[in-house]
């Protein structure tokens, strides 16, 4: 059983998938920073100094109006945190676009390789070549 597991774990596809997951996790951190620290602040300024992370709808009323999603959650108020959802949608769009660019380049590279590696047409069998020579000789006589 251990031998089978080792063979499975050391297959190229499993190792490639593991590397992809690790790189994906690191890429997620980069994208989150890009969205939260670089993209959203200018968008917030353009919209009048808005910080989307604190946009929410309180589902119950309380005596004290919470000023942030975290404050509302600490007070036990259920909220719909649509500002965080907006950030998540933007992050998803960035990741999807980045993956699109990578896959697009890979497909282009595969197409170039396929064009360069097109197999040469196979040579006709020797019998066929001899028959064509005989045919050509008979036509020349005739």
Curated annotation (Swiss-Prot):
SUPFAM superfamilies: Gated mechanosensitive channel. GO terms for molecular function: mechanosensitive monoatomic ion channel activity. It comes from the Bacteria. Keywords: Cell inner membrane, Cell membrane, Ion channel, Ion transport, Membrane, Transmembrane, Transmembrane helix, Transport. It is a multi-pass membrane protein. It holds the Pfam family MscL. It is found in: Cell inner membrane. One of its GO terms (cellular component) is plasma membrane. The chain crosses the membrane at residues 14-34, 83-103. Its main location: membrane. InterPro entries: Mechanosensitive_channel_CS, MS_channel, MSC/AndL, MscL_channel. Homopentamer. NCBIfam families: mscL, PRK00567.1-4, PRK13952.1. Belongs to the MscL family. Channel that opens in response to stretch forces in the membrane lipid bilayer. May participate in the regulation of osmotic pressure changes within the cell. This is Large-conductance mechanosensitive channel. The gene is mscL.
